[in-house]
Amino acid sequence: MFNDLLYRQYGLHIHHAQHALTGAGSDTWLLTCTEGDYVLKFPASGAIDHPEAEPKLCAFLRRHDIPACAFLKNHTGGYLSLDSDGRMFTVQQRFPGHTPDWNSASEALLLESAELLGKIHAVLQAYPTLPEGIGAGFFARMTPQRALESYRRSVAAALRLGDTESAADLNWRIGLIARFPTWQFDLNRLTCRNTHGDYFISQFLCKDGHLTAVIDWTSACVHPVIWEVMRSFVYAAPCCADGSIDRSLLARYVHAYCRYGTLSDYDLENLDRLYFYQIAVCDYYGQYYASTAANRHIYLQQAKHATRLLQSAF
């Protein structure tokens, strides 16, 4: 499928190409070539994705001992290439290891990933400021009222498709919005840092129970650090699969993060609140119904995972 394209632009001889099943939005292929193992990626084209910035950022991270992707240059000396349809793509060296399933991390891997996240935040303080992630724009756009309107549209879409289970989830969320706490977040008091932007277990490569790499830095941005701390925990810890949160394990996770990262009292006070707010006002069900991506089912999995957490908390 890609033999001529990759040979002309990179001089690679492909023996085998396997479609990657993880990751939402992007179209990713694992390549076995005469020259080695590589990853061919057609990145998502959303507003939060910045594939043009990824090679430089990853080179900086590798210089500071963060196991990030190494990109190949094409025949013109650039990192970004186009196929015959005008789709942008990159080629990266492939790290050894596999991507674990959600909520399957051992405690050792869980704490190792927390420590690495703290190190990423510390290292990236020396990098130029990245685009805004969860910030003032997010809170202006993503309000409970707008979530309510989106959920009502998604209920209608679910019922049209006969998806009664998702319709029930959405109706529960509509009820939640009516009684949701009136939390306010002071961005000037939250610790915000340059970060991966989408740091969780689906972006890990692991071998022998340890991290070998963190992949997919296309959505790197500035986030409140507690959002990424909490999100990475709830997708990795086995206890969270049914929506439960082991507070003792979460405390150990935060402690491991703080080996390199820093959290204020205000951060800790809002650790749960900020994440719960974000998953309450973001309509992943709507993303699923609107998407045409081959792997759009991941949006539905994210939606149901978030709903279980909210149902357990509220």
Question: Can you name each region flagged by the protein language model?
Answer:
Residues I226-T262, F276-A293:
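Active-site activation/catalytic loop segments of kinase-like enzymes and analogous catalytic loops
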Residues S26-T32, V39, R179-W227:
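Active-site acidic catalytic loop and adjacent metal/ATP-binding pocket
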Residues F2-D4, T129, E149-G197:
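An alpha-helical support segment within catalytic cores of ATP-dependent transferases
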